[in-house]
Amino acid sequence: MSTAINNDSQYISEQVQRTLKVISVMAGREAQGISPSELAKLAQTSPANITRALANLKQASFAERLPSDTSRWRLAPKLVQIANSVSLNLNQAQLQLQQDQQNYSLLAI
């Protein structure tokens, strides 16, 4: 990562940071969902910011309305799919490292 990005706050977007906070607040509420007003209170931001964040998350397939109550929102399966992909890739990398370690250990004998 670039040193400039590590040290320069000019690259930090308040809107992106708010949206990431919204994702964090929504996590764990997939069954019952959360209303925009609850979300605004917990994320400590305005209802307008929540409306904007939810619209962007929905557009990216990261959030969806609760099927049983369309006034409530939840995180969409796409985020779980991304997390599963990361987990799978890390597991594959770990297996490859274990295989490499075993192969190099055999060479030392």
Predicted features by range, described:
Residues S87-I109:
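Amphipathic alpha-helical dimerization/coiled-coil segments
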Residues S2, S9-P77:
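N-terminal helix-turn-helix
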Residues V80-S85:
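Short, charged/polar, Gly/Pro-enriched secondary-structure boundary elements
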Residues M1-I5, K58, Q102, L107-I109:
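Extended interaction regions within the primary functional domain
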